[in-house]
Amino acid sequence: MVRLLISTGEVSGDLQGSLLIQALQREVERRSLPLELMALGGPRMQASGAELLADTAPMGAIGLWEALPLVLPTLRLQSRVDHVLKQRPPDAVVLIDYMGANVRLGHKLRRWFPRVPIIYYIAPQEWAWRFGDGGTTQLLSFTDRILAIFPVEAEFYAQRGAKVTWVGHPLLDTVSVLPDRQLARERLGLKSGQRLLLLLPASRQQELRYLMPTLAKAAALLQQRDPSLEVIVPAGLASFETSLQKALEAAAVRGRVLSAQQADELKPMLYAAADLALGKSGTVNMELALRGVPQVVGYKVSRITAFVARHFLRFRVDHISPVNLLLKERLVPELLQDEFTAEALVQAAIPLLEDPAQRHEMLEGYWRLRQTLGVPGVTDRAAKEILDLTKP
């Protein structure tokens, strides 16, 4: 019997965790090895077969101010999880993204279980941030192996002494077969010639507050220009659905909010049918790129967090979208903090909706990006590495 603990947070981490769990189940079946999976994650990981010790999907926040409401819930959650892990120690630990919480957990588990391998899959993007090497040093102090999803990530951590395996980007396993665009448009009820705009605002509660009103206002302005424009907003979590609907109504947008369940079921159809997406920075940018959807990216945090990051932490980053970070160019328009306005979103969106040359340029850049990400079979390679490192 092998007992694994997988820890992640937020909507994107829950998705990646569920894909890894499915790959682990395939690999243990091949090895005829009994497997017990414990998880800090979300409903997708639970549905894939893990025992959910705590639901961390709603717990993500970026910024000091934004994280304050989560302090007490997080402490209560940690206390419950600590009790379980002391009663049922894992044979290996897999950390997925979710930097702050997973770094704290990694340090704790290294103290408690010195011989248990700790594997970081989808490690923090230290290679992209100009913060110095303090965070990297912390991460390497408790990590036995990093399973890197980007070549630049693998090189960065290897140069600093980590044991690294580059497995490729896990989204490659989910986009190998795309639905037919015309069939997808018919399934979504789109008329001939009608454009589809996706709004993708949030995998964290704070992002609903800071991003969605501006995205909705931009959608309303675009509908003034093209009254037939269809707007769809897929909910990342069921708890987001009401807030998303209210934001559309407040901006007088004619559009639909898809429930979290509908969003999961229809995601390939949405991407196949979409003409443009406006949304937050993060994993979704990579998914849009791999599915060939032109996009405009924005992000905003509280003024307090922005001030602290700029003036005290000296936070600097060349790009906020992973697409641009990997290509080392501004292929995807980015609007950060005060630049993130409805008018600026519209100005960036119009060429992508109306100029075929602009669309072609972005799609060509997506193709170049795709060549750097490896080949499908990513989660199977990650599962094999994890089990090879695990000693029951």
UniProtKB/Swiss-Prot annotation:
Catalytic activity: a lipid X + a UDP-2-N,3-O-bis[(3R)-3-hydroxyacyl]-alpha-D-glucosamine = a lipid A disaccharide + UDP + H(+)
UniProtKB keywords: Glycosyltransferase, Lipid A biosynthesis, Lipid biosynthesis, Lipid metabolism, Transferase
GO cellular component, one term: membrane
EC number annotated for this UniProt entry: 2.4.1.182
Pathway(s): Bacterial outer membrane biogenesis; LPS lipid A biosynthesis
Protein's GO biological process: lipid A biosynthetic process
Record flagged with keyword Transmembrane: no
Residues annotated as transmembrane: none
Class of the enzyme per the UniProt entry, highest EC level: transferase
GO molecular function, one term: phospholipid binding
NCBIfam families listed in its UniProt record: lpxB
Family of the protein in this entry: Belongs to the LpxB family.
Protein task: Condensation of UDP-2,3-diacylglucosamine and 2,3-diacylglucosamine-1-phosphate to form lipid A disaccharide, a precursor of lipid A, a phosphorylated glycolipid that anchors the lipopolysaccharide to the outer membrane of the cell.
Name by which UniProt lists this protein: Lipid-A-disaccharide synthase
Source organism phylogeny: Bacteria, Bacillati, Cyanobacteriota, Cyanophyceae, Synechococcales
